[in-house]
Amino acid sequence: AGVEITELSTHLQGQLVAVNPAYDEAFDAFAPAHLHGKPAARKDWAIDQMMKAAIASERLGLSHTVSFTGSLAFPFLYPWPQRPAGLVEEAFAELGRRWTPILNHYQDHGQDIGFEIHPGEDVFDGATFEMFVDACGGHEAAMINYDPSHFLLQQLDYLQFIDLYHERINAFHVKDAEFNPSGRQGVY
């Protein structure tokens, strides 16, 4: 018996693969101090860490990891003020350019990555996951880390999500969540 490792988590490293400049200072906290204030070097470090995690996962006899996609477009989630035409599409194209080589490396090492559908990430619901997979050429190593606690706050149907995406779910994280809106406060 004992404790069994089911997957490696690379949430912080994955986040740093794609950071909107508006978040640079905040996300520096996730990287080593010598990378603070150096977004390009921080991104390169994060990609290197992701590549190393694929090898570590393989050596541990695992086949799944979990991560975040990053947040190039998330500051523009709400459609007001109006986004410039093509902004979201270009952000997802850039995600595809950054993540496809990482996904290829994972696949070469018998791994896949379950991306957590999470507020604050560019992949925050089923529609954005589909956009991400399309941007990565339908990559088979792009999977979902299913954590329905976030779905409650986003008012997503967490059961129908399973019906729609069960073939892409590679991990399941469990924790409690509740939504208690009032006349003074909503989701956040």
Feature map (PLM): residue ranges:
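N-terminal substrate-binding region of glycoside hydrolase catalytic domains
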Residues: A1, S9, N20
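Short active-site-adjacent helix-start/loop capping segments
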Residues: T6-E7, G14-V19
